[in-house]
């Protein structure tokens, strides 16, 4: 998102990945956006690889971050390209569920589905309190545990998993 210190999206590579996804899946809807997780190139790589190869099937973002970027909130069925820290595409994800609520409303299941750290709610709250505090500072907002958060679940849509 806007607060990520990564290279700009490699548009040609994003378009090539999207074309491969559309050709393979037959999907005829739009690509909503291309984005990176986190606020550094290293974090974007780490979290992107957790999507591609691991347990990450959820993410959270401040409601205010979408507003600041002029982007709509995600909706179930959206397709997005996940970028690495170098701006190159790693995967296509499909949003399966979206809930908006205060940061403090995160539950154990969501923390587990984010696939980060030890996957507990306590770890998740600590890590996201630090992350969202940095975002709030960058946006000129005051952080609180009641701040609005978009809790989004997704599935890996591309590349196809091989069994």
Regions found by a protein language model. Give the residues of each.
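Mixed-charge, low-complexity intrinsically disordered regions
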Residues: 1-92, 98-163
